């Protein structure tokens, strides 16, 4: 409906006038406008604006037309339904218009008639208009309200809108009735003064007449008439009559000339029956009294809707007989009912007489009580009741004042037309219901046709109800007042009375009385109407059974009056009512269709409320169960759903359909929620419907689970397997009958999951012996079909209605953080992505990757930060408990399985966790829970607690990432500690990684940064002052960019809210960030900042801001940052430092790298945090053993941990340094060695260790394209491969004997601060993770120094295992002291060009590679690290010092050239000498072996070896072999074979030379002699070299032939040595 609006009443009148002008001429408009102002003057603006303006215009014009012509002798009444076509306006109501000369009672009387007929009045407008009319009644003028004058008349105009009358006959009948009422008003008003005159006339007559009446009585009657005339009576009519005798009574004989007022209308045309009166009425009318009272037989239609009162003056003859009666009909005015009885003539005499007869002292209690009773008695009773009856009644009322009981006093009207009843009821039991019961008894016993009542409350304990009942005067019902009173008492015997009796009867008097006192108001009226008291007693007992442990009780019942399919259940609980919107879905999900609900509240005297909810329901379609048989499990299910222990969803229907208890249903739901997380493809509702459609299979699945994890405790392995097989076959057989493919798939996946479940806490009670509120399941992920990749080794799923979470582990010894996720729908997908990154990040530490995530499902909506945090912590505790519930423990070195847990897997006691997003401060909580469980790791369970290393305080993650940044810039000739670099950051100074990172150097020029709230812009910052300000913000708790001192920001900068509509781009911002626009939205500005030319992009925030151009935003999965994100190729930062996780997609990193950017990956850059935590855990495991042995207190342990903080940090940063260095070394040769990486990836894929697509590594086709483009693998891709190579090597070492080798286990010491190795060396060798730590240290050391493909390359070329390769490497490492030389090179940072450093390291790597290969080829399975290092190490050290003295000819020249190059570059001489001779150092291995064979001095053998090489030009030949291009693996293997052959042949010739008989002693002479003795073959060899030098191009075939020639030469001596 369209309403109008108006600012004021004047505004409304203006709008109305404007609208009226469209319907009226200029002449009529002023008058109608004036009329309208008066017409609506009494109506509020609010009421007017609830109506259409068009309707107001219509009713105004309609009323005006009524007013235009009026005959004052004939009132105008119009009752009609406004219709647009007929009347020009319309309304949903019926309109009533009345125009009448202004008279009293008009409005009240019309309104009374409408109410009497049952019409609701919606609009009522009444106005008294001052008008001038013509003689014909035509309206001449409307005058201002209240105008007077000779020709001015006052006319009452009424406009009403009432309920719509549907029929024309109804409209006519109403119009006629209103006209009748108006007629009655007219005669009443017209005769009002004549009636008063008649009263005065009677008053005069009484003063003159000589009546045989006591003077006092006469005086009181006269006083009464005077009092009546003094505005105490509204005269409606007057009549005079006498009584004539008839055989069966009498007859009223009216004097028609006496009629005044209403009697003129009411007495016309009375029939004989109307005039007949009964004999008792005749007797009353002939009583010789002057003044009498009665009630009229019909209600008044004028002024007030009540039965009018008769006040009669009887004229007596000289004998005291009644001659006639002068009777006034009217209504006592309201003042009469408020006036004291002592001020009302006639009544006051009665009251005084009653007081006198009582004998009560008026100042005493009873006297005051009686006076009060008389004061408040209904005036009708006081007027009409004789003194004798009044006395007895008043005294009886006084007697009950102090007693809580019901009394009834009945009095008949003298005419027999009414019965008057006063009922006194105790206030505390009085109600409408009580009044209706009394009324019903009275109506039935008195056969009354109508009843009016008035209720009176005073300070008394009793309430009084006055009933006036209309009865048939002809009926002669003999009523026994005592019996009637008893019937009323019985009728009023309340439900509460019966209830109270039953409570005492059932609970005993003492308890019952107390309970009734506890619930003083008992059950509410609505309850009492529906239930008998004995039901209430049962319900009360249920309420009394409520407790904290049992907060909800449920009861089913079936009313006898209802069908079998309709049931009821009652829910009982305390405090707040159950919301229907909450309960209804629960019942419906249980398979019940709710038909209605009736809530009832009981209030305890202590203020606590108790509730009963009565639900009527039937079964949902398709359900056919016996509710009584399932009563217990259904009640149990409902109670746990309401309490939140179980979820409310479609799975609950299984309670009825499958007869499953709620926990079994919850079990199936938990599996379904896991199925959702592993992306089965069906929503939970469909999964539930599949189970409900096949309840037999659902039951069997639960049986299988119970058998595996409960019955298995009591069964032998054989019996368990037999039972499982039978159940599985039964399920498979049932599945064959399933017709719907999707349902079959769901049910089979349930079977798969149950079989893949290794452990569960489902049957593990809590400390109180109760079922746990959460479930945890340990899975064998490889047994779950179609699990999203990568597939972890183990997985634990924790489920409860409050929280869900998963923990994924890559192996038995695995570690990673637990994050508070907000992705309820796919948190496992989030965790899977993180564990994938964690797996490669953990390549540098002992454990393999693990990750966990939990989602609080019931965070308080609109809760405060503290409330949300509290709930998250509670959920975290549940999650941690779920993990520990099914994890083995260690006690005194023995594995202790968890109690009441059936294990279908091996011992698995290693479980450690760490902080992650949202759980940074939760480590102490986790360790506290671990302590409660007595878990063997103690506070090593969760690193970073109060007795652990504070990552933010140490700044370890940022420092580790800064190592990467330093390397990127160092390799570009920039020292970030000395040279200014421009930075754009993601995050704020309150953050750990961002804040610590931007304090790593005071040379950083932070030109821009942003977080979720602000954008910080400082186009031309001062590095020094901005550093100090950043430091201040970092130290300021909960700081933000808004706290930054704006005075320190350079011109054109500022701090802007991300919520701003737009940001003005200053010239300085345009210049710094290469922006063209004048204004940008905050999102657009951040987008531009990410693409700005800058030295460093430092990511310390949360979110993914860079994708590849081949990816969509949807692929990224970070919707919040879609508007900010840029492509990798759009980045113009020179370097990206990834302190935060997931800032770039992997493909974005690759794209950035391919476009010249310098970056690693997040798991490389920010590995410091996880590395630090691993050191902490390993140290604590070590020291906890020491504490348990009594060799140290926990306090001492904690002090030692603090003392080692810097040492631990140094170890961590050393790992970061080494790993990024290894990446730089790999990147140098990434293009030329691309085939090696291809082979590595292929091998890892073939062994199921790598999913190339999942890790975004290039396919073979993409590698071919890279080769064509002259590109190799990027650092981001190499980061993945270095991690995988370490992981793979660690696994291989753990499966071998390498970690058990006494010599090799010394590497373990490098994982700990030196202080620990010194003090607790023995305990360290007993470390529970000794094998893992040794394997980790060797793998890290090997890959960091020898390269990513080293192990793979040597495995392929030697056929040896990875463990053999690692063992040989350790020998080589220690024989040649490689770590020492690497450190010497690393110490040259910023002293020599980075490229020189990498070249030096390349040479060391080549030495290590060739030497390792030599050991593998020469020793095979006879490697003995301790022996070989002892044998070769000292001799190589000795020879190495004088290597340059041993070299000669071209060999020496080559060495000298290299040496000089290095020295010229700034390399220290000793280091330059060593590295320049690495290729010759390698030859010391065959030299030493030749020495062993010949028994000659090693130095002499070396001279011979190098002399042979010089004589045969083998150094040049070796260089040619080394320079052979490698395009495939076969060529690589051939090249290595050529070198091996050359090594053997040179050694063989050397041995042959040294073993010559009768030769000269000098080496040169012996070599010369040997050459002469083998001259033909020597010449053939030299000729071969000539051809090789002359060849325009060389290929492998040529060198194969050349090698054969050399072999012939080597074997030509009888002293040839067999190839090892």
Curated annotation (Swiss-Prot):
The entry's comment on post-translational modification says: Contains disulfide bonds (interchain).
Q: How is its activity regulated?
A: Activity subject to allosteric control by arginine and citrate, which function as positive and negative effectors, respectively.
Phenotype upon knockout is:
Reduced growth when arginine serve as the sole source of carbon and nitrogen.
Q: How does activity depend on pH?
A: Optimum pH is 8 for amination, and 9 for deamination.
Q: What SUPFAM superfamilies does its record include?
A: Aminoacid dehydrogenase-like, N-terminal domain, NAD(P)-binding Rossmann-fold domains
Q: Which GO terms describe its molecular function?
A: glutamate dehydrogenase (NAD+) activity; L-aspartate:2-oxoglutarate aminotransferase activity
Q: Pfam families annotated for this entry? A: Bac_GDH_CD, GDH_ACT1, GDH_ACT2, GDH_ACT3, GDH_C, GDH_HM1, GDH_HM2, GDH_HM3
- Report the induction information: Expression induced by arginine in an ArgR-dependent manner (27-fold). Induced to a much lesser extent by ornithine, glutamate, and aspartate (1.7- to 5-fold).
UniProt-listed Enzyme Commission number(s): 1.4.1.2
Tell me the active site.
Answer: 851
Which Gene3D superfamilies does its entry note? Answer: NAD(P)-binding Rossmann-like Domain
Q: Name the reaction it catalyses.
A: L-glutamate + NAD(+) + H2O = 2-oxoglutarate + NH4(+) + NADH + H(+)
Q: Is Disulfide bond set as a keyword in this record?
A: yes
BP GO annotations: glutamate catabolic process
Is the Disulfide bond keyword given for this protein?
yes
Task: Quote the function comment for this protein.
Answer: Involved in arginine catabolism by converting L-glutamate, into 2-oxoglutarate, which is then channeled into the tricarboxylic acid cycle. Can also utilize other amino acids of the glutamate family.
Please give the family membership noted in the entry: Belongs to the Glu/Leu/Phe/Val dehydrogenases family.
Self-association or partners: how does it assemble? Homotetramer.
In Swiss-Prot or TrEMBL terms, this protein is called: NAD-specific glutamate dehydrogenase
- What gene makes this protein? gdhB
